[in-house]
Amino acid sequence: MTKLLNFVILASVLTVTAHALTYDLNNSDELFKNFAIKYNKTYVSDEERAIKLENFKNNLKMINEKNMASKYAVFDINEYSDLNKNALLRRTTGFRLGLKKNPSAFTMTECSVVVIKDEPQALLPETLDWRDKHGVTPVKNQMECGSCWAFSTIANIESLYNIKYDKALNLSEQHLVNCDNINNGCAGGLMHWALESILQEGGVVSAENEPYYGFDGVCKKSPFELSISGSRRYVLQNENKLRELLVVNGPISVAIDVSDLINYKAGIADICENNEGLNHAVLLVGYGVKNDVPYWILKNSWGAEWGEEGYFRVQRDKNSCGMMNEYASSAIL
């Protein structure tokens, strides 16, 4: 049934032009019906359904516009296509500046700041993908909780541990959401603050002991799976130097403006501005070149059905999505 609906949504109602895939907006009602079935959407009233349908139509228009404007990426319907842009960004991101829960507990004594600006001294590999080196754990889903900061931080620690010890861990984002004394749970936070909180508390908990449920809960004391020895915050100013950092350090937590990627499906996003301000935390896991177009590879936390099995690519060397900023970070094991 799912495969049939995929075919209906992705094939039978698409018009293929010379440059892009474009939905026929006259088929919006049929598309919405199939969308609701595919993603198991239920609406409590006719009024709610009408609102969601209008959101869906607006997203179809944005998808068409993105596909016509983009040279290297495809945008399409996904499970969030019945949300308006503001609601989606509010519910499924979570990078928030200036939202300290408890400023008195915040010291930054363990976090060193590194400016990434000079050109690399060594010759770098043309491509790097930490997924091919068993340095990235499976994609997760933050659901409707502004906890991207926790997912990005945990993904960074999981990757570094996997690279160092050749052992995959599944660590608890929920423990960070509940127990981080600096960030604000589902209301948002920052990755380097999360690392500071981990250092203050003493360690990271396994997901087996505290599985993710996607809303703020009560902090409980669980045994630590591992500890970290320090943290770094990076001021990103040079994308070539960032390549070197990625090679030497491993996957890195980065902050972006994800607004232009809501409907991303595949390819290299060549139009990703920073017009809305930084709002999302993800994990930088690699880089490459395809058809002379350089790109970054990033791991999202919106589940494996979004994008390229939970990942996305953006064009390199143009500060895509505002990625060159002062909020990248990494743990030190």
From Swiss-Prot:
Disulfide-bonded cysteines: C145-C186, C179-C219, C272-C321
The UniProt record lists the keyword Acyltransferase: no
Catalytic activity: Endopeptidase of broad specificity, hydrolyzing substrates of both cathepsin L and cathepsin B
UniProt keyword Protease, yes or no: yes
Enzyme class (EC, first level): hydrolase
Biological process annotations from GO: proteolysis
Keywords assigned by UniProt, alphabetized: Disulfide bond, Glycoprotein, Hydrolase, Protease, Signal, Thiol protease, Zymogen
Post-translational modification: Synthesized as an inactive proenzyme and activated by proteolytic removal of the inhibitory propeptide.
Glycan attachment sites: N170
Signal peptide start-end: 1-20
EC number(s) per entry: 3.4.22.50
Active site: C148, H280, N300
Family membership noted in the UniProt record: Belongs to the peptidase C1 family.
Protein's name according to its UniProt entry: Viral cathepsin
The organism of origin for this protein: Cydia pomonella granulosis virus (isolate Mexico/1963) (CpGV)
Gene: VCATH
